């Protein structure tokens, strides 16, 4: 389902989807691999590191669970179930410094409109560690990716698989300095001005200096696609990139 490299050992963290197992594959001797098998949860999917890059947070999406794996000690820390929404789909998730709860990792969901924040600081915030500490209401179900950056004050959440076209073509933007503030809706596909057709946007990335956010507006093969560039600070449109090479 997913594979990442450990920041503590010469190991790959391999999540084997249906088995409910996470394998810590030690690779210095490629002909004699040493594998530590960690029992996590079935239907593992994608996930990402906490802010320290020690704990891997992986979604077992059909179990509505987030498994927390300690890549330093090679062991399961916890299966977070309480408070997790329906079918979590974090991509890599998003690391945030919550004003109230400290460092947290966030995921959105395919099956509902919630965004849950899980505490990830057992040293300084032990009461919040490995628990859902805050739940936000997003734009809608069908979310695939949730993104931010240490230098950004925004949390970007998509809903490209939502059955409502207006929702699937837009993004919700939360203010990280005030998470109780209502999110702003940006109509990404409308900004692209592609006419009829675009049914979803997907894939958000930032420039190296984190001044701009790039969105792909995907369309059918016989229609135009585009890249929409947003200023991360002002949330205003900077540019729309159109090219026939984007249509394939």
Where are these regions (language model features)?
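Predominantly soluble domains enriched in secretory-pathway, periplasmic, or organellar proteins
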Residues: 1-248
